[in-house]
Amino acid sequence: MSAIPSENASQSNQYGASSIQILEGLEAVRKRPGMYIGDTSDGTGLHHLVFEVLDNSIDESLAGHCTEIHVTIHSDNSISITDNGRGIPTGIKWDDKHEPKRSAAEIVMTELHAGGKFDQNSYKVSGGLHGVGVSCVNALSKKLKLTVRRDGKQHFMEFERGIPQHRKIELQDGVEISPIKVVGDTDKRGTEVHFWADEEIFNHIEFHYDILAKRIRELSFLNNGVHIRLTDQRTGKEESFAFEGGTRGFVEYINKSKSVLHPNIFQATGERLSEQNTTISVDVSMQWNDTFNEQVLCFTNNIPQRDGGTHLTGLRAAMTRVINKYIEEHDFAKKAKVEISGDDMREGLTCVLSVKVPEPKFSSQTKDKLVSSEVRGPVEEVVAKTLTDYLMERPNDAKIICGKIVEAARAREAARKARELTRRKGVMDGLGLSAKLADCQEKDPALCELYIVEGDSAGGSAKQGRDRKFQAILPLRGKVLNVEKARFEKMLSSEQITTLIATLGTSIGADEFNIDKLRYHRIIIMTDADVDGAHIRTLLLTLLYRQMPLLVERGHVYIAQPPLYKVKHGKDERYLKDDLEEAGYMMQIALNDAALVPTENGTPISGDALSELVRKYNTANAIIKRLSRAIDDAALSAIMTGVTLNLDTTEAAEQSAAALSAEVNDPSVEVSVSSDALSARHLLRIARRHHGNLKVSVIDAEFVHGPDYGVLAEAAATFKGLIGPGAVVRRGSGEKMRESAIADFHQAMGWLRDEAERNVSKQRYKGLGEMNPEQLWETTMDPTVRRLLKVQIEDAIAADQIFTTLMGDDVEPRRAFIELNAL
């Protein structure tokens, strides 16, 4: 354990209360949250809250003070970020104009533009320059808990919608102060921020694991020496991110599922003085692969810029100048009789560009574009020099890269000719609409839907079953061309693809695509639930993702969800989406006329009371099933049978471990008390040995104080002692009554399910062709009852790798992916 820095450290590199500078208040954040964290309706702003706190921990890492970060999505959809950095300063800021004078930690959490990032003695480079990050998170959270471990003490403060709670005013030297509460001693250090997003601000407060994992992966690659752990308590999923290699390792990771053209990754690193006499650090890596797509990721002080900026401009200028010069000197273009453009150089390029800039300037608080003009020159200089040397020293790699660029120029020229030909035929601008298209009457694209269906037979049913006012049907016969393996000119020679392009009306290609001409704002892929249908759906998604990504990004693409079951019970006939819905409906039938007699001569339980028992039982079992991937299911079942857990003290934790072990009663399971390395809180460690393999799971204080544990404990209180001697479950009345003796509630549930199956007929659908037009409308096309899945890309790198794996040339990665993910 490293020494804990004191609040009264020496002036050099001091990070104490005096480092915190206040610039203005927080008032506008809740009124206009979009100005600070982005859109509050589509999830970007919600996840930006996490990134703001995470960036603070990464800044501690950049300053050399943090090596461990733990991000946890709790079962109640709250988020905690814990690090082992220096901890936010906790001393009283005596130059605070506020009365009473507050601790530096409170100021950081409640004042806009307050932080240590404006003083270069505290942080040389930082992503959190604006100083609005963590205070914005506080303002936009219905509740936030701050724990600071610093100077041997553990401090705690709680906020509600940015307002400090339980504040204590003290008098020191005749001055009123409001110190942060000390809750104990500790030998640890660091900051923990645990917040609950405010439903009054955000339309949805459900955090997506993949979005967080994408950002954490980026940070891990860009910051050697920091270990980041991401845990999702809702599903039990957990990953550790500790990548090495910087931008070179990042490029290698992105290209791992692709066929690279040259084994040696180009990397340029260096530092240059800017016009403002500040040091700018540049790290860029590039490698070409055999695909036709450019993938360039830009970062400034670890913050991603999806819109690029001056650093990307410098990179492209250097590439164009150096590569053009090399191609001219070696007559590559002259021999091929083509002219090279910048787009040709970037076809198949994977590039990660990272710069470290003191006081960077961004276009907005979301930092999507770097606008610091002084960055372009250093990037261009570092890349130009290193790329010139790379091409000269590795002639084989240079020849391969230039060959790829020349081939891209040839293909661009061929695509131009093909585009002109198809434009003359009216395909690119939608004039040559297919005769198979059954168009709708509505002319407003925002109200129109296009169903892309598999084959003429399904198309016929869909055409008859649709509402022709706003629903158009386009049947596609056979397999769509796999665009992952095809060049642009080959795509334009495919009848199915040109038909789809003409129908959508947007054209295709980087220069021609125009989303404003989209004729249907809902594009619904409707294929069978069999293997062929899944393949066609994947081919269509590949086409849309690779060639028309804006359709996906703007939420225009959907997948139809036809029902899996048709169930008939007496005169009642209904369609059910999946196995879960079918199980719920069957239990509803089972409870009709059912009664539970818990003991001999006991009072029967029926109606709403029995339904409530079933609901509690099913809810508790669903939690056990969901959490069993993270926590041993025998331990969870023990909680449901009545074991009470308490981890507040060492003695209570040891008693809980003993009780849990006794209830599980399995010699292959060992329950012991442990503690979390960062928070020093007690944990229960459950080790199960099965056929020589050891599986370890953990129960922590967050789980014990969380809603899932509460549901299991409530179920335990309900069912413990409910079923006694002579208990029976029955259904019906009079001569038609049937009953069975039971030993526990689980047995009663099984008997009721079996009874429900007796008078029900079920049909399981395999494809759309099994439905007539009326059924297709009722189940899949009627907007009032249908279910649609919106296609969204949360992790672009992961999506890119999945498309490459599934649709690329390599068989082994595809086989491994299918084996891992097959049901």
Give, region by region, the residue ranges found by the protein language model.
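Conserved phosphate-chemistry cores used by DNA topoisomerases
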Residues: 2-823
